[in-house]
Amino acid sequence: MNIALVAHDQMKNTMVGFCIGYESILKKYGLYATGTTGKRIMDETELNINRLASGPLGGDQQIGSLIVTQEIDLVIFLRDPLTSQAHETDIQALIRLCDVYHVPIATNLASAEIFIKALDRGELSWREVRKSKSQRI
């Protein structure tokens, strides 16, 4: 199971705190992150992050590509709802891909905590079943 971690600039500290708090759970999974977010997490934790490009430089689109190829099973995208983003269309495309491919996406800390606790309890294992069935078709 692979998790994508993305955070807008004003939410990076929150993402780092989240990763520190749930490091024992997150370390069990493959982790992908946009460039700056991934660096910040790696600087503050022992987590191994597959870093992609920075969000505005195509990182969101790279995560979208991983969603299409069923390599991402959960997206935690801590968005800043109070600041306009220059790459808003990329963000909307990423959210749309999560909807199309049935990938759970958390866009705030509350939903991120719900998903990470569900993941720890094995409640997202349906993703693995779904992937194995689609590979047989």
Swiss-Prot record:
Catalyzes the formation of methylglyoxal from dihydroxyacetone phosphate. It comes from Clostridioides difficile (strain 630). CDD domains: MGS (cd01422). The keyword Cytoplasm does not apply. This is Methylglyoxal synthase. It catalyses: dihydroxyacetone phosphate = methylglyoxal + phosphate. InterPro entries: Methylgl_synth (IPR004363), Methylglyoxal_synth_AS (IPR018148), MGS-like_dom (IPR011607), MGS-like_dom_sf (IPR036914). Residues 1-137 form the MGS-like domain. GO terms for molecular function: methylglyoxal synthase activity. The lineage of its organism: Bacteria, Bacillati, Bacillota, Clostridia, Peptostreptococcales.
